[in-house]
Amino acid sequence: MNKKEFFTGAVKQVFIIPVKIYQYSISPLLPGACRYTPTCSEYCVQAIEKYGPLKGIWLGTKRICSCNPWGGSGYDPVP
């Protein structure tokens, strides 16, 4: 692993860790309300892993904004 790969992986983890904290500490206390599969938080993690922090957060934000009664639902994987 070279320095660039290490740095990229570390930056991704900086953005993934807060989502994982949410998934394991806050999400279990709330009723299941996500209309999509995978859940919006898991979608965000997958998007960050696949595209990096900037595009991953953008895709995750768009997904969270569409997760409402007037938005979509069902299976929606990271593009």
From Swiss-Prot:
Function noted in UniProt: Could be involved in insertion of integral membrane proteins into the membrane.
Keyword ATP-binding in record: no
Sections of the chain in a coiled coil: none
Gene Ontology CC terms, in alphabetical order: plasma membrane
Recorded topology in the membrane: Peripheral membrane protein
SMART domains: Haemolytic
Classification via NCBIfam families: membrane protein insertion efficiency factor YidD
Source superkingdom: Bacteria
Subcellular location: Cell inner membrane
Name of the protein described by the UniProt record: Putative membrane protein insertion efficiency factor
UniProt family annotation: Belongs to the UPF0161 family.
InterPro entries for this protein: Membr_insert_effic_factor_YidD (IPR002696)
Keywords: Cell inner membrane, Cell membrane, Membrane
Keyword Kinase: no
Organism: Cytophaga hutchinsonii (strain ATCC 33406 / DSM 1761 / CIP 103989 / NBRC 15051 / NCIMB 9469 / D465)
Principal location class: membrane
Membrane spanning stretches: none
